[in-house]
């Protein structure tokens, strides 16, 4: 059974995540004090029900040791996983402005910007321990729920999931990435008028990139690096490894290379997911 702990900065989508987990059959509790986690788990263990609990800045323990103690007291039947939701500062400010809700720390005479920064510092012990960090800056409510369903229901039990995502540097680096590779030095299909409207998923773009030795060398050396360290990462109690590939716009080179890497590790029997941030933004 799984005990999913959902945390993250206010406005990042914790309530949405908890509702999505409830739809997946999790027994959900909002803002349960950390010290009560073992009691909840023992109660649900006999019923063989997985649980999801949200923890925000209001019910954070005074020290990381209290959280670690609660985790160590969980029944053996439960496998704890920590999901941390985040978004960039400007997105959080915009969301609060749109909803006109008060930030949980605003009552301490802090401005919204200061409250967001203070909360980030207070939640850092949980963020650093997270099994999965999700950047919701560019996600709608429905996209976040669907992504969680895909990652949580699609993942094999106790196996590391490799996530390959493409992005454009002009849109910013994904904050959920464990590794970031820059491919802006590779030949750019953008300068071919026939290829410009296409993406790295289209065969003519793939054929263009496939003709260049440096593209093959980069893919080979990147996958070799990941293969070298993958056994260590798999034994390090991780659930996800997110590898971000970036080019200028996130449309051609990064998409192609992310797909090549995903296909390679998928062919090796790994649990693999891929996503393309720029292409997802362009969907109607």
Curated annotation (Swiss-Prot):
InterPro entries: P-loop_NTPase, RapZ-like, RapZ-like_N, RapZ_C
GO MF, one example: ATP binding
Swiss-Prot/TrEMBL keywords: ATP-binding, GTP-binding, Nucleotide-binding, RNA-binding
Pfam families for the chain: PapZ_C (PF22740), RapZ-like_N (PF03668)
Residues bound to GTP: 56-59
Binding site for ATP: 8-15
Top-level taxonomic group: Bacteria
Annotated spans, RNA-binding: 266-284
Family to which this protein belongs: Belongs to the RapZ-like family. RapZ subfamily.
HAMAP family in the cross-refs: RapZ_like
Role summary: Modulates the synthesis of GlmS, by affecting the processing and stability of the regulatory small RNA GlmZ. When glucosamine-6-phosphate (GlcN6P) concentrations are high in the cell, RapZ binds GlmZ and targets it to cleavage by RNase E. Consequently, GlmZ is inactivated and unable to activate GlmS synthesis. Under low GlcN6P concentrations, RapZ is sequestered and inactivated by an other regulatory small RNA, GlmY, preventing GlmZ degradation and leading to synthesis of GlmS.
Subunit structure: Homotrimer.
Protein name in the entry: RNase adapter protein RapZ
């Amino acid at each position: 059974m799984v005990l999913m702990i959902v945390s993250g900065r206010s406005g990042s989508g914790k309530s949405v995540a908890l509702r999505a987990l409830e739809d997946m059959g999790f027994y959900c509790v909002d803002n349960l004090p950390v010290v009560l986690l073992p009691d909840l788990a023992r109660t649900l263990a006999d019923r063989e029900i997985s649980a999801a609990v949200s923890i925000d800045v209001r019910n954070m323990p005074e020290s990381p040791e209290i959280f670690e103690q609660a985790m160590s007291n969980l029944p053996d039947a439960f496998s704890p996983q920590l999901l941390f939701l985040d978004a960039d500062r400007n997105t959080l400010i915009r969301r609060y402005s749109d909803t006109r809700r008060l930030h949980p720390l605003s009552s301490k005479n802090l401005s919204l910007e200061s409250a967001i920064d203070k909360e980030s510092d207070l939640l850092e012990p949980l963020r650093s321990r997270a099994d999965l960090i999700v950047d919701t800056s560019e996600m709608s409510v429905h996209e976040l729920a669907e992504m969680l369903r895909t990652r949580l229901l699609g993942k094999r039990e106790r196996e590391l999931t490799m996530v390959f995502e493409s992005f454009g540097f002009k849109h910013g680096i994904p904050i959920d990435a464990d590794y970031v590779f820059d491919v802006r030095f590779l030949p750019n299909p953008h300068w071919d008028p026939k290829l410009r409207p296409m993406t790295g998923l289209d065969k003519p773009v793939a054929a263009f990139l496939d003709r260049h030795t440096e593209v093959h060398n980069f893919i080979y050396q990147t996958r070799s690096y990941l293969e070298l360290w993958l056994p260590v990462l798999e034994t390090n109690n991780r659930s996800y490894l997110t590898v971000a590939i970036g080019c200028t716009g996130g449309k051609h080179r990064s998409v192609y290379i992310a797909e090549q890497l995903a296909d390679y590790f998928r062919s090796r029997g790994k649990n693999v997911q891929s996503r393309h941030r720029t292409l997802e933004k362009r969907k109607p």
